[in-house]
């Protein structure tokens, strides 16, 4: 990353996968408590040219991600769903970004991007939701079911990073549809994958912590003081819908066993 505010000076190095989401053109990047805006990204040269700015918002990249399961190492049933882990191929493209205001998390703008698609082989933990599992939530529309699963992904990422004691950016989250001749209807997979080529050994331990992950997400969401979702639990309500938080809790209640008492959580 090169600061062009006064002179062309290298001020930081960022891993390439992270640079695509954090150093795209017009991104706001925080370095040593100072804000920088990316003026230009040299994709081939692996350089980002930034200028010092002061603004009241940050940027959040919008990506389109597909995950294909290459090999399942292990799996087990989970209250009508299935938990598993294995090797996957992740295809990801950054297609835009949002401007989010500090403190209020208000979306104050957006922009389009067209970065090349990236392919990565890594390892992933996932939950598979058969059509029969989702159909039991008769009070939810198909869109609300999708929003609920997206909200779960946000909560799972937070809890997983605490359980694994890693940076949340070390984990990628993607909601994809499982397609095969055996599958009939919409049967999504919610992936939490290692955000590094080849994986860094997070998926197998997370698979072993499935019960803690589910219980932790349920406690996190239910104990959050927000009304309809926030970045601290299921994500902003504008992204998961007005019922996204409650719908996510309904799914977690089934996964954990409805009526089980909530246990205190340290986060």
Where would I find each of the regions flagged by the language model?
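Extended, highly charged accessory segments
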Residues: 1-23, 27-33, 39-267
């Amino acid at each position: 990353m090169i600061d062009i505010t006064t002179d062309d000076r290298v001020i930081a190095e960022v891993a390439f996968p992270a640079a695509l989401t954090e150093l795209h053109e017009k991104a706001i990047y925080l370095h040593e408590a100072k804000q920088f805006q990316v003026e230009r990204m040299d994709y081939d040269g692996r350089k980002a040219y930034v200028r010092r700015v002061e603004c009241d918002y940050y940027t959040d990249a919008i990506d389109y991600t597909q995950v294909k399961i290459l090999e399942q190492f292990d799996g087990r049933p989970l209250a009508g769903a299935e938990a598993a882990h294995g090797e996957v191929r992740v295809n990801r493209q950054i297609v835009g970004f949002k401007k989010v205001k500090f403190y209020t998390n208000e979306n104050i703008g957006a922009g389009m991007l067209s970065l090349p698609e990236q392919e990565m082989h890594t390892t992933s933990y996932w939950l598979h939701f058969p059509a029969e599992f989702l159909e039991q939530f008769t009070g939810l529309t198909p869109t609300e079911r999708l929003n609920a699963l997206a909200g779960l992904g946000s909560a799972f990422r937070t809890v997983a990073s605490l359980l694994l004691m890693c940076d949340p950016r070390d984990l990628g989250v993607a909601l994809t549809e499982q397609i095969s001749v055996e599958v009939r209807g919409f049967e999504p997979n919610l992936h939490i994958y290692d955000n590094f080529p080849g994986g860094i050994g997070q998926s197998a331990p997370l698979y072993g912590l499935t019960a803690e992950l589910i219980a932790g997400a349920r406690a996190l969401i239910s104990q959050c003081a927000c009304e309809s979702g926030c970045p601290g639990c299921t994500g902003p309500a504008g992204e998961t819908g007005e019922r996204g938080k409650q719908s996510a809790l309904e799914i977690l209640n089934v996964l954990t066993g409805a009526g089980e008492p909530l246990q205190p959580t340290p986060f």
